[in-house]
Amino acid sequence: MSNTPYNSSVPSIASMTQSSVSRSPNMHTATTPGANTSSNSPPLHMSSDSSKIKRKRNRIPLSCTICRKRKVKCDKLRPHCQQCTKTGVAHLCHYMEQTWAEEAEKELLKDNELKKLRERVKSLEKTLSKVHSSPSSNSLKSYNTPESSNLFMGSDEHTTLVNANTGSASSASHMHQQQQQQQQQEQQQDFSRSANANANSSSLSISNKYDNDELDLTKDFDLLHIKSNGTIHLGATHWLSIMKGDPYLKLLWGHIFAMREKLNEWYYQKNSYSKLKSSKCPINHAQAPPSAAAAATRKCPVDHSAFSSGMVAPKEETPLPRKCPVDHTMFSSGMIPPREDTSSQKRCPVDHTMYSAGMMPPKDETPSPFSTKAMIDHNKHTMNPPQSKCPVDHRNYMKDYPSDMANSSSNPASRCPIDHSSMKNTAALPASTHNTIPHHQPQSGSHARSHPAQSRKHDSYMTESEVLATLCEMLPPKRVIALFIEKFFKHLYPAIPILDEQNFKNHVNQMLSLSSMNPTVNNFGMSMPSSSTLENQPITQINLPKLSDSCNLGILIIILRLTWLSIPSNSCEVDLGEESGSFLVPNESSNMSASALTSMAKEESLLLKHETPVEALELCQKYLIKFDELSSISNNNVNLTTVQFAIFYNFYMKSASNDLTTLTNTNNTGMANPGHDSESHQILLSNITQMAFSCGLHRDPDNFPQLNATIPATSQDVSNNGSKKANPSTNPTLNNNMSAATTNSSSRSGSADSRSGSNPVNKKENQVSIERFKHTWRKIWYYIVSMDVNQSLSLGSPRLLRNLRDFSDTKLPSASRIDYVRDIKELIIVKNFTLFFQIDLCIIAVLNHILNVSLARSVRKFELDSLINLLKNLTYGTENVNDVVSSLINKGLLPTSEGGSVDSNNDEIYGLPKLPDILNHGQHNQNLYADGRNTSSSDIDKKLDLPHESTTRALFFSKHMTIRMLLYLLNYILFTHYEPMGSEDPGTNILAKEYAQEALNFAMDGYRNCMIFFNNIRNTNSLFDYMNVILSYPCLDIGHRSLQFIVCLILRAKCGPLTGMRESSIITNGTSSGFNSSVEDEDVKVKQESSDELKKDDFMKDVNLDSGDSLAEILMSRMLLFQKLTKQLSKKYNYAIRMNKSTGFFVSLLDTPSKKSDSKSGGSSFMLGNWKHPKVSNMSGFLAGDKDQLQKCPVYQDALGFVSPTGANEGSAPMQGMSLQGSTARMGGTQLPPIRSYKPITYTSSNLRRMNETGEAEAKRRRFNDGYIDNNSNNDIPRGISPKPSNGLSSVQPLLSSFSMNQLNGGTIPTVPSLTNITSQMGALPSLDRITTNQINLPDPSRDEAFDNSIKQMTPMTSAFMNANTTIPSSTLNGNMNMNGAGTANTDTSANGSALSTLTSPQGSDLASNSATQYKPDLEDFLMQNSNFNGLMINPSSLVEVVGGYNDPNNLGRNDAVDFLPVDNVEIDGVGIKINYHLLTSIYVTSILSYTVLEDDANDEK
C-alpha cells in the first residue's frame, strides 16, 4: 500500500511501531534476506531436546522494502527513510502496513477528509462574500475568472495560478499569508479591469471580459459518419473533428465538393459522348491464344450488353477464335490434361455461365498469392457489379485433387486462380494468404516452416486434437518460448500489467511441460532463464486440463507474437538525413558491459528466427476459446482468465495493426477491416466491461469472505501437477488464477498436513496466494478503467464507466498487502497504477467538459482556462499530480464520484517526472526522481538497477504526449471560437492570437516528440527499447494531429484575411495572382532567402506566429520532414501509408507553381491551352463516390448540408443582412450558419506592402484580358472591410451547383440570383448550403448591354451555363463548341439529341470572337484559371487529384459500393489511393490547400 506523509500533530504509525519495537527486542532478530516471514531464535536457556515444532511469527517487517532488498539498515522514517533518499529511490520507499494499524489508518483518513471539507467550505464562503461585495454588475461575470476561481481550491498548496506557473512550493505556514495577498491583488485587478474594459491586454489572465463566454462544442465539434452498413459518431477529441471548427476548412470543402460535381459532368460528357477509341474488351485476348478446342467458339466470354448505355461496345480486334482466359496448364494432370490431349479433356474449372450473366471477376487491386498473372484486364471496363459467387466451379476444380498437394503451399496448382480477397460475402481466405504481409517477415536465416493450417480452409471444421497438433508445429521450441516470456515480462509487461507473473509461468509449465523453465533469480528479483537447463526441443504436446487453460494458451500466443514484433531489430529503419541528429536522445548502452551487449545480441538473433504465425492465434481463439460465442451470447465460461485474454486481444489488435485484417477476415464478429479508430474496438471494450461486471470486478475482493476459504482448497488440485480434471467443488475462476501460485509450497508440505491445512507454512502460503489473487483482481479492473478513458479520448465517444465511485468500490492495487521484496518490479507496477489513475482523472475532467452534452453545450471559457493551467502545471512539473487532482475537485471541474477520494493515500513524491528528465536520463545518469542533493559515489554504487525502468520511462513519455495533445486541443477550440470575432470585437484578436500561439507550441511539441520516438526505436538499449510496436501508432497519431494545425496556419499565412467566396482578397501574404514581374522577382528572392534560413532551422525550437512571410515556409519544412518519415514507416505500418499519401498530397498542393515557367508556354498564367499534365487523366480521385455516398460524408454534410433541388424562384433564407430573393426556407435542405469575413491571426502590419502590389497586378491582368483598366477601383481598402462594388456584374458566385443532363434535356435552364442582391452586404458570407443552389438566375443578354463584356469576366462554370442557353444543332459526337462574337455557342449533341455543356474559358471565348477560329475546351485551361484561393495558387494537377475523375453512372447506387470516406477501408491501386476516412480528414484538415475558388473580379464593373 502507498504511504501518505503524516502530520506532526497526529501520532504516526512509525512512532507507534517504534514503541512496540522497544517493547519487543526479539523482533530485531536477523532474518533471512528476502523471506516473507522471520522466525525467533529460541532462548539459550531452553532445552535443546525440545520436540516442539519451530513456529514462525506472523510478523510484518518494519523496515522498508528497498532497504530489505539492499540488505542495509533502515531508519524506519516515514514517509521515506534516509537510505532510500540518499540513493535516489525515495519514490519507491514502501512500508508494509501492520494489521493492527488499519483502524488507526481509517481514523487518519477521516480526519484528513474532514479537514479538506472545512477548507472547501471556507473557500466557498469567501467566494460568495466577494460576489455580494462587488459594486458593479459585472461582478457576477468576473467571479468565475481563472484568477478568482482558484478560491475553490481551498487548502491546496498551489492555490493561485501565479504560484502554479512559477513552480513555487511554499510551506503550509506561508500559504495563508500568500492567499490573503493574492485576494487583495485580485480585488484591485477587478476594479482596474472594470474601469478599463476597452484597454488592450497582452495576457489572458488580465482580461476577464470574455471569461463567461459560452461555447457550444456539441455543434462545432461533432461528426456523424453515415455508411451504407452502419453509422459512426465521432466526438470533439477525435482527430477528424478539427475540420468542423475551422471556418477556412468549411469554405474550402464547400468549394471542393461543388468543383467535384462540375468535373464529374465534364468527364461524363467527354467519356459518354465521344468515341472511345481506347476502349477494349476487358479480356486480354493476347494472353488467351487460340486452340483447337475453342476454335468453334467465336463469342467473347464478356457480356458486352452489360456496358452502360451510350458507350461504344468494345471492338474485337481480330476474328481469331476465343479461348478461356484461364491458363489450363497450371492445373494438375488429374484435373485438366495438356492442350494436346484433347480427347480426355475434362470440364474447365471456370463457371462460364457467370460470364453470360454479365458477371466479371473482381478487380485485382492488390497482388494476390493465388494469381500467377493478370489474365483479365479489369482496367479497360468500368463495371464492377456485386459478385457473390466465385466464377470458378470448385466442384470440378477440386475433383480428383491430389492429396500430396494439400500441404504444398508453393505449388500454384493447390490454389484457386481467382483472388477471393476482393470479393464481397465470400468465404474466408486460407491461412497461407494471411502470412503474406511483408512488413513483419523475419530476417535472413529465419525458419519458413509450412504449417498444415496454411493450406487448410479455416471455414472447415477442425477438432480440438487437430488444432492442438497444428499449434504444436506452429509454436517455437521450449527454450525460445521461455526466452520470449522473459523478454515480455522484462520489457513489455508494464504496458499491460494484468497478469500474475509466477502464476502465469506455472500455467505455461503445465500446458507445455516446460519443466526446465524454473527460473534463476538474479539480484534484482528478475527471473532469467538458465540456458544450461533449457533444451532446444520442440513442443510435442499441449495439455489443457481446464477450460480456462485455453485462454492462457491464447495469452501465451499473443505474448509470443507481440514480443517478436517488438524486437528492436524488427523495428523500421528511419533516416531523416541531417535532421536525425536533432531528435536523438542518449541511451544507456554505455553503462552495459561488452559481454552483456553480446549476450543480448545473441538472444535477439535467436528470437528473430522463430516467429509465431498469426494463424496460431486465429486457431486458438476460434476453436479452443470460442471467443465469438463468449463475447456475444454466452457468459457461462467467463472468468478472470477470459477477461485477461479479451484485454490482451484488444491490446494486440491496436498494437499489431498489420495483423488486424488477418484476424478479422475469418471471424464472424462484425469487425471487418477494423482500424485504430473504428467501431470494432468500441464493441470489444463494451464486451470486456460487461464480462468484468459479470465477474464482479467492480467490487473489491475484500467484500467476499468466501474467497479466503475457496482459494486454499485449490492447492490440493495443483499440488498433483498433472491432474487433468479440476476439483468440481472448487470455483473454476479461482482454481485457474491462483492455484499455481501455491504449487511449490503444497509440494513441500505433507499430504495430510496439506489436506488438513494445519501446517503453518502452508497456511502462510495460502494467505499469500489469496492476496496475490486479490491484487490481480484490482489490476484488471483499473486497467479496464484506463482503457475506457483512452478510447473515449481517441474516438470522442462517451465513457462507459462514468462516475466510477457510484457503483464501484474496488481499491487501487496499492491496497494489496503484498511483500514486494522478492519482486521489486511489481512494486513499480503498483506505483504506476496509482499515478496513471490520477492522470486519467485529469483526462476525465477534460472529457467531461468536451464530450458530456450537458456540459459541452454551454461550457464556459474560464473552465477551459482552468483546465489548461492545471494540465500545464502537471506536464511542466510545477505541481504534483495529487495537487492537480485536488484542484480539479475543489474548483468543481471533477466530481468526487469519479474517484478523486482515493488519492488521499498516495505518495506525493511519486509523480510524473518532467519530460526533459525522462529524455536525458541516460546522459546525466541520474534517477528520474532525484531530490536535488548531491549523491556520493558510495550511494551510487548501492543504488538499485531498477527492472524495466526504460519501459516505465517510455510510458511516462507517452503520458506527457497525451496531456500535451489535450492542451493543443483545448487551445485550438478556443482559438477557432475567437478568431472569427475579431472583425466585430477587436478585443478578441489578442485572445485568438495567444490561443493560436499556444496551440502551435503544443502542436510542435507533439511533432518533435513523434520524431524523437521514431529516431530512437532502433538504438541499442534506448529509452524506447521493445516499445516500437506499442507506441508507434499513438506517436504517429499525435504527429498527424499536429500536422493538421500546421496546414491551417499555412493557409492563413498564404491567403490572408478571409473575405468571402465571391470577393477578392483584401491582401495576401504569399504570391499573388498578378503579372507584375518585379513583385514576382521579389517573391522569388524572398523565397530563396527563406529557403537558406530553413536549412539552418532548428526543429527543436518553437515556431512564432509573428515570423511573417517565412511562417509558411517554416511550417512547410515540418510537413516535408513528416512526409519523409511516414514514407519510411510505410514499409512496416499500414496506417503510415495513409498518412504518407495524404501528407504528400497536401505538400504538392501547397507548392506554389512557378508563374515564369507557366507564362512561357502561352504568355499568360491563365491561358495554357498547350499545357498538358502527363497523368492528369489517369489520376484516381480522392473524392471518388456517387452522390448518395457523398451526402453521407460528414465533411459534405458540414460544408454543404443535405440540399435537394429547388424551384427556379427559391433561394436561401436571409442570413446576416444578405437579402436574397425567394422563400426563406428550402425544401429538404438544412440551413447552416454563415461564416463571417475576418482576418486570420497571421495577419500583420507588414502585409500592407502587398496591397498596392496586388492592385497593380490585378490592373495589369485586366489590361491584358479586356483592354481597359478600372481606375476608379479602390485598392486601399481598410482592414476588416470587404470591398463593395457599385453595380453591374462585379462578382458572381464562383462555384455554381451542379446541373444534371436531365435538366438540360428537359429544357430547364439554370439561373443565378439577382446580382444586386448578391453584391449587397458583402461583409457577411452566404450560408454554406447556397453553394449547391441548383437554380441560378443569369441576366438576360437582350436586356443588359453590359452582358457581352461581363460574360468575359465570368468564371468558366458560369460560361458553361450560359452556353447551355443557346441553340444546339445536331451534328457530331465530339462535343466541341463553336463560339461566335455574340457569346452564343453551337454545341454538338449525341445521337439521342442530348444537349452538351462544355467548359469554356473566358480567354478562349475572347480569342474565338476575334479570330473566328474554333476553340476546343481544355480541362487544364479550366483548372489553371480556377487555381487561386484568396491569393493562394494551387497546383492544378493536384486539383484534379482532389476533385477526382469521372464516375460511371452505372455504378452509382450499388449496394456494395464503397462508402465515401470509409473509416476502416484502405485500398491502394497502381496510380492513386482511394480515399478513406483517415485520408479525407487530412484532406479536410490539411486540404485547405486544395480549395479551388474560381477567379473573382470584384471591382471590374462600371
Swiss-Prot record:
CDD domains, per the entry: fungal_TF_MHR, GAL4, ZIP_Hap1
Main subcellular localisation: nucleus
Record-level GO BP terms: cellular response to hypoxia; DNA-templated transcription; establishment of protein localization to chromatin; negative regulation of DNA-templated transcription; negative regulation of transcription by RNA polymerase II; positive regulation of transcription by RNA polymerase II; regulation of cellular respiration; regulation of transcription by RNA polymerase II
Domain of life: Eukaryota
Extent of the HRM repeats: 280-285, 299-304, 323-328, 347-352, 389-394, 415-420, 1192-1197
Coiled coil (residue ranges): 105-134
Residues reported to bind Zn(2+) 2: C64, C81, C84, C93
PANTHER family linked to this entry: HEME-RESPONSIVE ZINC FINGER TRANSCRIPTION FACTOR HAP1
Oligomeric form and interacting partners: Binds DNA as a homodimer. Interacts with SRO9 and YDJ1. In the absence of heme, binds to at least four cellular proteins, including YDJ1 and SRO9, forming a high-molecular-weight complex (HMC) which results in repression of its activity and dictates its DNA-binding specificity.
Protein name per the record: Heme-responsive zinc finger transcription factor HAP1
Source lineage: Eukaryota, Fungi, Dikarya, Ascomycota, Saccharomycotina
